[in-house]
A protein has these predicted regions:
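Catalytic cores of RNA-modifying enzymes
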Residues: 1-156, 160
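Short, intrinsically disordered, charge-balanced linker/junction segments flanking boundaries
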Residues: 171-173
Length: 173
């Protein structure tokens, strides 16, 4: 799904002969995620506009309290490096955040490679990173039912970055 009409024309010229390549013009945040030809889309490869990374991730892999509208096996996404580092951050590291917990409860995230800003024309002000995301398949409705509770816990747990966890969640418990 591509919003830029000029890019759509170029992509169609370059990839239209690929039988497994599907391109639709539109806004990825509102366009249907199903294939137009009735086939199942199970992989997504995308260069995400940095300003819609959060909403797009919610749409593609779901939220703690809401299952995604489609189930994708694999997402390979190019995104702003700082956001990607938070997605893949491990507990105890400086990039570990509520976003890290949310995403890692929903999917396995793997660092693929860095992409310096100089690789783009025009060059953005920030570097990028490619991340592979493999969403977990949960058919358990209980998982999504406790999502609101998990969201509240995360809000309290990460409210004071330098505070001890027992102090920040004291009011939660």
């Amino acid at each position: 799904i591509e919003l830029d009409r000029d890019l759509v024309v170029g992509l169609k010229k370059r990839f239209s002969h690929q039988s497994k390549f599907s391109l639709r013009e539109g806004d990825v945040l509102s366009a249907p995620l199903e294939a137009e030809n009735g086939l199942t889309i199970n992989k997504v490869v995308a260069n995400i506009p940095y300003n819609i990374t959060g909403p797009l991730l919610k749409r593609l892999i779901g939220e703690l309290r809401k299952a995604p509208e489609n189930r994708f096996e694999t997402l390979v996404l190019l995104m702003q490096k700082e956001v990607a580092q938070r997605l893949i951050a491990l507990p105890g590291t400086s990039n570990f955040s509520a976003l890290s917990v949310r995403i890692q409860l929903l999917a396995k995230c793997q660092d693929v490679c860095d992409v310096p800003s100089k690789c783009f024309q025009p060059a953005p002000k920030v570097d990028s990173k490619v991340v592979m995301i493999k969403p977990f398949v949960s058919s358990e409705p209980d998982f999504y039912e406790i999502g609101n509770l998990l969201e509240k816990l995360l809000k309290h747990a990460f409210a004071g970055r330098r505070k001890k966890l027992r102090n920040t969640i004291g009011s939660f418990v």
